[in-house]
Design a protein with these regions (language model features):
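Conserved AMP-binding A3 loop
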Residues: 20-22, 146-172
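Conserved AMP-binding/adenylate-forming
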Residues: 34-74, 236, 275-400, 406-409, 423-426
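Phosphopantetheine-dependent thiolation modules in NRPS/PKS and related acyl-activating systems
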Residues: 37, 453, 505-622
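AMP-binding/adenylate-forming catalytic core of the ANL superfamily
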Residues: 91, 352-353, 363, 368-369, ...
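Conserved pre-ATP/AMP-binding loop-to-beta segment of ANL
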Residues: 131-150, 157, 180-186
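Conserved AMP-binding/adenylation subdomain of ANL enzymes
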Residues: 169-186, 193-281, 290, 315
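Conserved C-terminal "lid"/linker of ANL adenylate-forming enzymes
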Residues: 438, 444, 474-528
């Protein structure tokens, strides 16, 4: 594989050290020589993002063998499945992961060669550095299985997706027209390289275009921003969650002042990228000042985020695909961005929309099949060669729009079909108080399960988030929705939804979550001081539920307006605390108890007097 003509150009940065393309290729050849990888064998890579991951990856390819890339966060128990299913003969790993590999092999009672890259001293491996043979990385043959990647899946056991070298080349060739990379580009290996999107987009393509990759020691927002500034990063590939976090931080800053709100509205109206780049120069400088565009993939991006970043002078190009299509099916041209679309179908890929709106795909990029699973392969690729994505969508003016998941459609007892994503998007657009929402059928009725943005709730001093969302958001949605799409129940939760490792919500687990059947993380020891114990006992008595130090008083305990009136009176009576919006400021039991301990007046002992409560002006909006 001819990667680059200028061997002295920097290929990688890691721990403040630069690795040239010549050094990169030589290190790859040394790994190959040292590990003696056999042709046509399966070899596993199980390590965190680091240069040795790419050396090992290309050494496997150079040997015309198959690379099995596994998520470095996988547990030993999960590893037993991957090792057993993939028939690997070598496992490339790191000091950080090796104990989990040993534990998995012990469980399986298998002997497989473990190669710990930290223990390989590349400087001690002798190789002819001037030999032309050692300055080239060979690629597998087109029909060879180059990769086996396991789908995380929202249900069932992971399946090993077999991708040929030609599958991968098809995507590289098709994306060439978009000029994703140029020789002067610098990107960051932010996403884990066991996924096909970052593996291709961050691990392979930059090297084919003579660009530069930066590896981070610390995956944190501070480390990311520092690296973007230090290395003058020009392009970044991320998932929607990354852009959501960045968007929230930027927009919170803009909305905090009237003048910046006005400037943003003005820039939005003018709708000129050139104007926005000047007026919001500080935003660009916050990302290092050299960003050309961002790329988003993995799941659908909220179109408002795309629009707002455009108003800020930054392009986000969205792509759509799946592991089984190597991965890209459609991609957004950086000079023709259409928010809410997944871009244009890429060259040499055919897409058609089935009668039931499912997106079907055919092309060189479609996988060879699932490893040792012909039945599952036959379920997803029909006799005519069309791969059934399971996604719903439409084609308009050459752009592909993904509208939902086929298996996530809700079929009501009256036969009506409901696309939950459509309702979720609509309700989310009506308020800034929702962090995440899932529309599901629970106890045979259409239910909105909402995880609020608790920081926003606190900032806006909302004491009863349930009633705010129910009456100010969901009820207003219901007033305009057809009867069969009306939300009949609202559940507020104080925890993240169960998700796959790439952040997709496991919708089939929502009912179990609501029923309390999902095991929660072990809690820290309970605090033990007077105010905490007394408030906790009171809450247990009135709600009849388990109460913990991190329990959200309103959401976890289901406190309604009358409960809140009584509780506020309890705090007044016992601690002399009459402060407004107390629960929104200190929403958990421990936060509230600590505040009471530090701010209580002389305690007044007495029992609750309902006559006094009912005569008291509560200012509560009762439904």
């Amino acid at each position: 594989m001819q990667i680059v003509t200028d061997k002295n150009k920097v290929a990688l940065y890691y721990k403040d050290e630069a690795t040239t393309y010549k050094e990169f290729i030589l290190n790859t050849r040394k790994i190959k020589q040292f590990t003696k990888i056999k042709q046509f064998t399966n070899n596993m890579i199980y390590m965190e993002n680091r240069p040795e991951l790419l050396y090992s990856f290309f050494a496997i390819w150079d040997s015309r063998a198959t690379c099995v890339c596994i998520d470095a966060s996988s547990t030993a128990e999960e590893m037993t499945y991957y090792i057993d299913n993939s028939d690997v003969i070598k496992i490339f790993t790191s000091n950080m992961q090796v104990e989990k590999v040993k534990e998995a092999l012990n469980i399986l009672n298998k002997q497989i060669e473990i190669i710990v890259v930290d223990e390989i001293n590349l400087n001690e491996i002798k190789i002819d550095e001037n030999s032309s043979e050692n300055l080239v990385i060979n690629s597998p043959e087109k029909e060879d299985t180059a990769l086996i990647l396991y789908t995380s899946g929202t249900t069932g056991k992971p399946k090993g997706v077999m991708l040929t070298f030609d599958n991968i080349l098809a995507n590289v060739d098709s994306l060439d027209v978009y000029k994703m990379y140029e020789e002067t580009d610098i990107t960051i290996a932010l996403l884990p390289l066991h996924h096909i999107l970052p593996l291709l987009g961050i691990g392979v393509m930059p090297l084919l275009y003579s660009a530069t990759i930066v590896f981070l020691e610390d995956i944190s927002s501070a480390a990311l921003i520092d690296a973007m500034k230090k290395y003058k990063v020009t392009m970044l590939i991320g998932v929607p969650k990354l852009w959501e976090v960045m968007h929230k931080k930027i927009m919170d800053t803009i909305n905090s002042k009237g003048i910046t709100r006005f400037i943003f509205k003005l820039a939005k109206k003018i709708n000129s990228l050139a104007f926005s780049k000047v007026i919001f120069k500080k935003v660009s400088e916050g990302f290092g000042g050299h960003i050309k565009f961002f790329v988003s993939g993995g799941s659908k991006l909220n179109p408002q985020i795309t629009k707002d970043f455009h108003t800020l002078g930054i392009k986000i190009c969205e792509g759509y695909g799946m592991t089984e299509t190597s991965p890209i099916i459609s991609y957004t041209p950086k000079n023709d961005i259409v928010p809410d679309s997944a871009g244009r179908v890429i060259k040499d890929v055919e897409v058609k929309i089935a009668d039931d709106s499912e997106i079907l795909v055919k092309g060189r990029n479609v996988m060879k099949g699932y490893y040792k699973n012909p039945e599952a392969t036959a379920e997803i690729i029909d006799k005519d060669g069309w791969l059934h994505t399971g996604d719903l969508g439409k084609l308009e003016n050459g752009y592909l729009y993904v509208t939902g998941r086929k298996k996530e459609m809700i079929v009501l007892s009256n036969g009506k079909n409901i696309n939950p994503i459509e309702i979720e998007t609509k309700i989310s657009s009506m308020t800034n108080l929702i962090s995440e929402i899932v529309i599901t059928e629970y106890n045979s009725i259409l239910t909105a399960v909402i995880h609020p943005d608790l920081e926003k709730v606190k900032d806006e001093k909302i004491d009863n988030i349930y009633e705010n969302l129910k009456w100010e958001v969901v009820d207003k949605y219901n007033q305009k929705a057809p009867d069969y799409k009306k939300i009949l129940d609202v559940k507020i939760i104080n925890e993240d939804f169960p998700k796959t490792k790439i952040g997709k919500i496991r919708r089939f687990m929502i009912a179990d979550m609501l029923d309390g059947k999902i095991e929660k993380q072990e809690r820290k020891p309970e605090p033990d001081f007077e105010e905490y114990n007394k408030i906790k006992k009171y809450l247990i008595d009135i709600k009849g539920k388990d109460v913990y130090f991190d329990s959200h008083i309103e959401i976890d305990l289901g406190m309604d307006s009358l409960d809140m009136v009584e509780f506020q009176y309890f705090l007044d009576l016992n601690y002399g605390i009459k402060e407004e919006n107390l629960i929104s400021k200190y929403p958990t039991l421990l936060e509230l108890a600590n505040y009471i301990k530090d701010n209580r007046n002389q305690e007044r002992i007495g029992n609750l007097d309902w006559k006094e409560i009912l005569n008291k002006d509560t200012n509560a909006d009762l439904p």
